[in-house]
Curated annotation (Swiss-Prot):
Binding site for ATP: 39-46
Record domain Helicase ATP-binding: where: 26-415
Coiled-coil parts of chain: none
Record domain Helicase C-terminal: where: 431-597
GO MF entry, a single one: ATP hydrolysis activity
Pfam entry (one): ResIII
Subunit annotation: Forms a heterotetramer with UvrA during the search for lesions. Interacts with UvrC in an incision complex.
Protein name: UvrABC system protein B
Gene3D superfamilies to which the protein is assigned, alphabetical: P-loop containing nucleotide triphosphate hydrolases, UVR domain
Notes on the domains: The beta-hairpin motif is involved in DNA binding.
GO biological process: nucleotide-excision repair; SOS response
Motif (Beta-hairpin): 92-115
Gene name of the record: uvrB
Amino acid sequence: MSKPFKLNSAFKPSGDQPEAIRRLEEGLEDGLAHQTLLGVTGSGKTFTIANVIADLQRPTMVLAPNKTLAAQLYGEMKEFFPENAVEYFVSYYDYYQPEAYVPSSDTFIEKDASVNEHIEQMRLSATKAMLERRDVVVVASVSAIYGLGDPDLYLKMMLHLTVGMIIDQRAILRRLAELQYARNDQAFQRGTFRVRGEVIDIFPAESDDIALRVXLFDEEVERLSLFDPLTGQIVSTIPRFTIYPKTHYVTPRERIVQAMEEIKEELAARRKVLLENNKLMEEQRLTQRTQFDLEMMNELGYCSGIENYSRFLSGRGPGEPPPTLFDYLPADGLLVVDESHVTIPQIGGMYRGDRARKETLVEYGFRLPSALDNRPLKFEEFEALAPQTIYVSATPGNYELEKSGGDVVDQVVRPTGLLDPIIEVRPVATQVDDLLSEIRQRAAINERVLVTTLTKRMAEDLTEYLEEHGERVRYLHSDIDTVERMEIIRDLRLGEFDVLVGINLLREGLDMPEVSLVAILDADKEGFLRSERSLIQTIGRAARNVNGKAILYGDKITPSMAKAIGETERRREKQQKYNEEHGITPQGLNKKVVDILALGQNIAKTKAKGRGKSRPIVEPDNVPMDMSPKALQQKIHELEGLMMQHAQNLEFEEAAQIRDQLHQLRELFIAAS
């Protein structure tokens, strides 16, 4: 099923990219365990990594620090490798409240969670691809270091069906129930099956657009066919099919029975300890809760919070690391840690926070001590499990530099010839008035400005001051959620306003080519917001514009400022020299404004490989902002016809999507007229 990695790009490596690709590949082939790619903003780091993957033909996991960046990377990798398995593995919780106990108020908080169906399907698709194929790139968040089902048990539970196989209908249904598929003859959806005579329809848990039809004759599999679950149209007939479990946490019955005995033994030992310490209430609570869970496991094969017994279910010893996504990655796999200066500290912090909460639950009799082994990986365990690793960052941390032995692969020259911003240091006394005049110069030529302050109060006051002086300004702060944050950044790029004020605007990986000025107020106040790495990241936000400039307001030059200025000047010098030698004129990036949220929320839709008649007649896209009234009118008529067509085909979701798009277009038409 695997194909060779085939890179799809109109561009060839240029600037520092060819040398970076060569050095990274040589390092991997020489067996180097750790390498660091220091790639400046806008130098095409993702393209470099895609070239390395394509040249070496190795399965790869890319770790990103958050869901937003993971979605952005997933979209880019999907474009680079359209014919290969590019998968997305992040936490499937839209909302998650872990169980916790607060002793001071005697409050127990039950676990509460809301699971995103699309992301759950994509996680299952990711592990399936890793088990079946070599041409796989999985883009993951730090969710990858959390416990997952044991790959050996997961493989044992699979149901293999082949044409001509002797198996009766009841045996298939029993196996599907073991895989946690539910029978539903009315609503056919992911992770369910239905039975009609001697035909069983199965909707695989990892699929979003294809289902399996098993036609039996007597006790023999007569035909296997793939069909569209929406229209029922047969897509193809196949000789064999493997059905994967509905969840990563399925366990064979014999393993559950064995685990129950081990849980009973631990319960007896723990009860004894609690009684010896005169903790009668805790002993009673633990006994009641554990026996209820055991009863559920005996009857149903699982219980609420079964992950707390994962050590027994996977047959691990006390303190052993849990199985994670790393266990699904082949031994010769490659790990790429994106924005490593943020991701690596995150990995280190996950275990400690989880441990503190669980210790309280164990101490007060809500959980058995074995629940402590349902946890993310410790940092040392992550290091031991990680295959050959490439750390990617514009500002690598000390850990990455130390692991790479100080041998860093530089990617400083951009293919576009763009230079790092010019840096100026100006006095604090006149910073606000000076900033106002700089903003007016930029706004006049349709360029944008980012301003970063040290405190929330200062950001609010500055925003108010700029508004009073007639500037179009918005304020970005920690109370704004991810969705609204991305909308604000999109509006800045579209020119809805000119200035964005914030406290920590150095969000890694954000592409804003329209920003030509970054102003850093109180740059001489040492601290984590004004450290060398923070300053370089913030300055880098203006590196995608031909007129990029950074103004640091400070009365003295701190060591962090000196290092940041020195590093930026080193890069700028190297870039200028390269441009002169190769006759390159810097060109601004004309990058279209893509709504990253649409990618994050509807990410599963990009996986559709074509669905026969059920395929939407129109894919909802971003409404073009520069259409003439005549073109808008034409587009409206076209979409109205398509909407009616969808409604006639009973495809109401697609019709509703077009209806929403029509609202936007009509508003634009009225404004343009």
